[in-house]
Amino acid sequence: MKVECASNIGFCFGVRRAINILEKTASERGGVETLGALVHNQQVLNRLSGMGVRVVKNIDDISGRTVAISSHGVGPAVLAELKSKGLEIVDTTCPFVKRAQVAAKRFHDAGFFTVIYGDVNHPEVKGILGWAGGNGLATLNPQGLDDIPDLSRYIGVLSQTTQIPTGFTSFVKNVIDQALVKDAEIRIADTLCHDIRDRQAAALELAGRVDLMLVIGGHNSANTRHLLDLCKTVSNTHLIETASELQTDWLKGVSRIGITSGASTDETTISEVCSYLDRLSAGA
């Protein structure tokens, strides 16, 4: 049984940057609170907790004088409230998310209605909507804007950073088809994360060459679920968070296994899965 990892695996640039910032802050100050989970990966959060990083869900729960913004970012109203309380803000927002926030603000300032291709319940999308100044919406409806009445003639379109590129492209085409009949002006911002795009392409290529594909990452991680959906289109694929979730009956008749991971999956977890597979292979 041969195991091969995708060429783009482990922490993405934005997650690694956020973790480095938090580790440094926690070390210097003996701990730090984050407004919301830094990433959607429990193993990483457990390790950070051991370093004194505490997750708070609401601003009123903050007990210290320093608070970290997660890699998913927040809207301007949240930032203003934190500043009004005199809190020192450590911003770990992913640069790609920041770029999407800037695009939404630019649309708003130009008088455009912002349409985000993304999950309205995801913290990243909530933050981006905040930068649209209340003049926007988020949807994953592949048909575009069919269900939205009285749409503005001025429309700015962008994407949640971790969405699948082909999905965003299809969405944009549908928006254009619907909006042009209304004599609309449309602006499109490419806010997809380059790292995630490369990761998805590498995973898809590997999935096409193996009998079984394993995606390692948090079950509540958006980018991990997108990897799962992509790989399932070409190979038998399962999502696991740790090696303990791997089921041996998946391996029956399998000679080649491919591995990819979500952007917030740490190298230790990946190594544990690979080691477990090696032991199973040796005992076969």
From Swiss-Prot:
It holds the Pfam family LYTB. It comes from the Bacteria. GO terms for biological process: dimethylallyl diphosphate biosynthetic process; isopentenyl diphosphate biosynthetic process, methylerythritol 4-phosphate pathway; terpenoid biosynthetic process. The keyword 4Fe-4S applies. The keyword Oxidoreductase applies. One of its GO terms (molecular function) is 4-hydroxy-3-methylbut-2-enyl diphosphate reductase activity. It catalyses: isopentenyl diphosphate + 2 oxidized [2Fe-2S]-[ferredoxin] + H2O = (2E)-4-hydroxy-3-methylbut-2-enyl diphosphate + 2 reduced [2Fe-2S]-[ferredoxin] + 2 H(+); dimethylallyl diphosphate + 2 oxidized [2Fe-2S]-[ferredoxin] + H2O = (2E)-4-hydroxy-3-methylbut-2-enyl diphosphate + 2 reduced [2Fe-2S]-[ferredoxin] + 2 H(+). Its EC number is 1.17.7.4. InterPro entries: LytB/IspH. The active site is at E124. PANTHER family: 4-HYDROXY-3-METHYLBUT-2-ENYL DIPHOSPHATE REDUCTASE (PTHR30426:SF0). This is 4-hydroxy-3-methylbut-2-enyl diphosphate reductase. The gene is ispH.
